[in-house]
Amino acid sequence: MPRGVIALGIDPGTRKLGWGVVARAGNRLTHVAHGVIALDGSESIASRLVELEGQLTQVIRHHRPNVSSVESLFFNKDAQAAAKLGHARGVVLLCLAREGIPIAEYAPAKIKRTIAGTGQADKRQVALMVRAALSLTSLPPVDASDALAIAMTHLRLGGLLQALEEAKGVGATATAENRAQVLLALLAKKRPRRITVRRRVG
């Protein structure tokens, strides 16, 4: 991952959307900004999505991130809530793609494990680790803290795949098939040696 990369992490929602911007230079992560886009719950879902698109676009254009990361959609027993969250994620992906920003997605457990060391961490544990890692003076709002954690996850994990791709001449615009071919080639070169165990006789 190049020096001075700026990552925008987003925790989608139809009432509150958290966002966090983190910069990386070498191995050092630096807090840039964070916030929460609060939407009027009394408005229709369509109206909220329009408002979300406008405010998120302003955030993206102001901070001009190099990369972005979004929490992936997880299965929810409440089908209606899951559908609304899917609408919000669609708007988020649209805004990022329209600005030409590469998008990575991470499962909630992956984010928790990367930041707090366990996939079972609660939101406060994640927030405390975010505050410590970024040297913040206070705990950010929960949604913003989650977004910062998402950005940090990509800065810590996303660089490896990109470095492998660049080493093989595969850029950020490569297709999923090309990326898969690169990984398969690398794995083929790193197959473990076969060890033969001989039994002692007598």
What are these model-derived regions, one by one?
Residues 1-202:
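Phosphate- and other anionic-substrate recognition elements at nucleic-acid/protein interfaces
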